Regions:
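Single, function-defining residue in the core of a domain
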Residues: 1-73, 81, 87-90, 95-440
Length: 440
């Protein structure tokens, strides 16, 4: 699957017997999604060992199979639906990222589910007053607790989520001494002041907060944003959030944390674009500008999980084009594809960042690394510029070799190798590895 950078069985299996083997594996009831997920988590835990700080980034995506619904109905009476009542499954992984290098190292959990077409509506369920455990939004708490439990105890864990994760129960249940939250705020919450009988809305409080600093960062093009250097105004305050006045969290004790408000100045905001603006709620101590900017940097790592979804859906793996007939087979394929897509993505990231701290052992076996040494020597040219400049057995070193196998010239004047280059390089590498194993 990694070699052919596809989640479509007919594409990642060359021969008929390979295709039949893949179909039998995915449809084998004795091979569960839980067993595959357990392997992914074990790999992530191994990769996380010895790391001081882990960013555990949550997000949800829809995998839509509406184009194949008739095929699926042959084996499954009701394959389940996602948004817009279309056939599919929800995917909610927690991507674990090393906080110092900003390189992903695996998954601490992956949740998949869909809805019954006969499920009651939010109004019929009286959704606002349902216990949080009965809501789909409980996934944010459940996945946060799993990250806390699965990852090494001595590592600091920061659970990162976008606006959907702004749930009061998350703040009251998850944080410990070394498990922190960094969540983008969306709700207009009440904040308690020194006088317990007085409160003010969070947005009002932050708009009136003292301007702490101005700083800038580069915005890459995409998602309706133009490339630019965004000039930001930074504010932060310690706040005490009051429990909601309605719903299952009503009457809960208030929660004390920090709010970071960062907003782009009009001088750097392009015409017809809204300014970048984030209100981040965090349990990390934020008493200096440096601490606030560091938290913002961690939050900006959310682009990694968004990029992973793009790789999984469009840039090669095409998971929504997989033509399997059962939900269970598709969910197994999604798990396997996630790990394969991550390996391809990390190769490109390691090359782009020129990071020599990450070991290639995370994504390559010892035998594969031995072959990388052999192939790497042959991939180097006669000039200094065509020599692999990276520390041996680092991920950047491996990425340079794979890029060369993918027909990258090693000259800086040539464009940076992309996903297709790394796909082609991996294809050649694993073809050579099959022969290498036979010989050795």
């Amino acid at each position: 699957m990694v070699v052919h950078q596809s989640a479509i069985v007919n594409q990642f299996s060359k021969e008929h017997k390979e295709k039949m083997g893949a179909y039998r594996f995915l449809n084998n009831s004795s091979v569960s999604s839980d067993a595959i997920l357990s392997g992914l988590i074990h790999t992530c835990c191994k990769n996380a060992s010895g790391r001081q700080h882990l960013l555990c980034i949550q997000d949800t995506s829809e995998i839509n199979y509406e184009a194949h619904v008739e095929r699926m109905k042959k084996k499954t009476a009701s394959p389940g639906i996602v948004g817009q009542r279309q056939c599919g499954t929800f995917l909610h992984p927690v991507l674990v990222v090393d906080a110092s290098s900003h390189i992903p190292i695996g998954f601490s959990s992956v949740k998949q589910w869909n809805r019954s077409p006969a499920a009651l509506s939010r109004e019929e369920r009286n959704y606002r007053y349902q216990p949080i455990e009965e809501k789909e939004s409980y996934r944010w708490i459940e996945s946060g607790m799993a990250a806390s439990e699965q990852m090494p105890r001595d590592a600091v864990k920061t659970i990162i989520g976008d606006r959907e994760a702004d749930i009061f129960e998350l703040f009251s249940r998850i944080p410990t001494d070394n498990v922190h939250l960094l969540i983008r705020s969306v709700h207009e919450r009440n904040c308690r002041l020194d006088d317990p009988d007085c409160s003010v809305q969070l947005n009002t409080l932050m708009e009136q907060a003292v301007l702490r600093a101005e700083y800038s960062f580069e915005v890459l093009p995409g998602s309706g944003r133009k490339k630019r250097v965004a000039c930001m105004e930074l504010r932060f305050e310690r706040v005490t959030l009051c429990a909601p006045v309605n719903g299952p969290a009503k009457g809960s004790p208030p929660v004390s944390l920090y709010c970071i408000h960062v907003k782009e100045k009009s001088s750097s905001t392009p015409v017809n674009e809204s300014p970048i603006e984030w209100r981040l709620l965090t349990t990390h101590v934020v008493e200096t500008v440096e601490q606030a900017i560091e938290c913002i940097g961690w939050y900006r790592c959310r682009w990694l999980i968004e990029e992973l979804f793009r790789v999984l859906k469009r840039k090669g793996f095409m998971i929504e084009d997989a033509q399997l007939e059962t939900v269970s087979a598709l969910q197994k394929l999604i798990l396997i594809s996630l790990q394969a897509a991550l390996q391809v993505m990390v190769l490109k990231l390691s090359f782009d960042k020129e990071d020599e701290k990450l070991s290639s052992e995370i994504y390559f076996t010892s035998k594969e690394i031995a072959l990388l040494h052999i192939v790497g020597k042959k991939s180097e040219g006669n000039t200094k510029i065509q020599q692999n400049p990276y520390k041996k057995e680092s991920m950047a070193w491996a990425a340079w070799i794979i890029a060369r196998l993918g027909a990258w010239s090693a000259y800086k004047s040539q464009s940076i190798p992309g996903y297709i280059t790394f796909k082609n390089g991996l294809d050649r590498f694993y073809t050579q590895f099959e022969l290498y194993e036979l010989i050795s």
